[in-house]
Design a protein with these regions (language model features):
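C-terminal alpha-helical interaction appendages
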Residues: 1-71
Length: 71
């Protein structure tokens, strides 16, 4: 599975903070997962229900980012 470049990740995070993240309504983990899914659905789906799935648990955000970012 192709991972994201830093430029692609920047696009995802821009979308998070402009369109997806609403504190008190949508958690950051949900917003990040949804943004990745919007642009890269296969990549997001490959991490669903894994130890890196941050949709339900914000403590997994760093693991999600590690899994999607091509370092």
């Amino acid at each position: 599975m192709k991972k994201l470049t830093y430029e692609e990740f920047g696009k995802v995070m821009h979308n998070v903070y402009v369109h997806e993240y609403f504190p008190g309504v949508i958690r950051l983990g949900q917003a990040i997962f949804n943004s990745v899914y919007k642009y890269y659905p296969e990549l997001a789906n490959s991490l669903r229900n894994t130890g890196a799935d941050c949709f339900y648990n914000d403590n997994k955000i760093i693991h999600f980012i590690d899994a999607i970012l091509d370092k």
